[in-house]
Design a protein with these regions (language model features):
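Extracytoplasmic loops and strand-loop junctions of Gram-negative outer membrane beta-barrel proteins
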Residues: 1-9, 60, 89-97, 154-158
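Conserved small-residue
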Residues: 1-13, 53, 73, 133, ...
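Residues that define the transmembrane beta-barrel architecture of outer-membrane proteins
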Residues: 15-19, 102-107, 124, 166-170
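Outer-membrane beta-barrel pore domains and translocons
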Residues: 26, 37-39, 131-135, 177
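Repeated loop/turn-to-beta-strand initiation elements of outer-membrane beta-barrel proteins
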Residues: 29-34, 118-119
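Membrane-embedded beta-strand positions of outer-membrane beta-barrel proteins
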Residues: 34, 128-130, 174
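Extracytoplasmic gating/loop element in the C-terminal half of outer-membrane beta-barrel translocons
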Residues: 39-127, 131-133
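C-terminal beta-signal and terminal closure region of outer-membrane beta-barrel proteins
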Residues: 57, 67-75, 89-91, 139-178
């Protein structure tokens, strides 16, 4: 980012810490497992929000138009169109769309039951489980999932550019042991 010809760093896309807690509980054939994960630190950038603001189709730009403009530094009222065309452009203010990438989520939850061996004539063990992934974003400072990426290349980490929402999945596991 350049300011008066000098460059400054908005932050690193890499987190300071990645945390995870996995736990599995079993009682009388009933199984409960969960995975909580967290990412602390790092920054992410929303090119989606910048473009929506630039073209005047975001909620923020609509609210600013309805309010008669944008109050800059608490003193100067600037037209919403001029403000968002300036900050939303590629030469605008990327720090306006840069967010802390810290987030905590329930990454996985499973609930299962193992049928008693005698039900299968002591020949096998059958376990049935319901499993869910990416079930709950407990806390996130960015207005999007900072762990979603548009590309696996090194140059696109931490950038939201009209990405699809994070997928939540539910499934059924069947485990048969002989």
């Amino acid at each position: 980012m350049a300011d008066d010809g000098k460059e400054f760093l908005l932050g690193s896309v890499f987190p300071e810490y990645n945390l995870a807690w996995r736990n599995d509980l079993t009682w009388k054939g009933l199984h409960l497992g969960f995975l909580l994960s967290g990412r602390i630190g790092g920054v992410c950038y929303s090119a989606t929000q910048a473009n929506l603001d630039l073209y005047g189709v975001s909620k923020a730009s609509a609210d600013a138009r309805d309010a008669g403009g944008v109050l800059v530094n608490g003193r100067q009222l600037v037209s919403a169109q001029k403000w968002y065309q300036k900050v939303g452009s590629q030469s605008g203010l990327p720090q306006y769309y840069t967010y802390d990438a810290t987030n905590f989520r329930l990454q996985e939850l499973s609930l299962g039951y193992t049928l008693p061996r005698k039900w299968l004539k002591d020949k096998a063990t059958l376990t049935l489980s319901i499993v869910g992934h990416n079930l709950w974003m407990i806390w996130c400072k960015a207005p999007f999932d900072p762990e979603s990426v548009a590309s696996t290349g090194n140059n696109y980490q931490g950038i939201d550019y009209f990405m699809m929402p994070s997928l939540r999945s539910l499934g059924l596991n069947v485990k048969l042991d002989f």
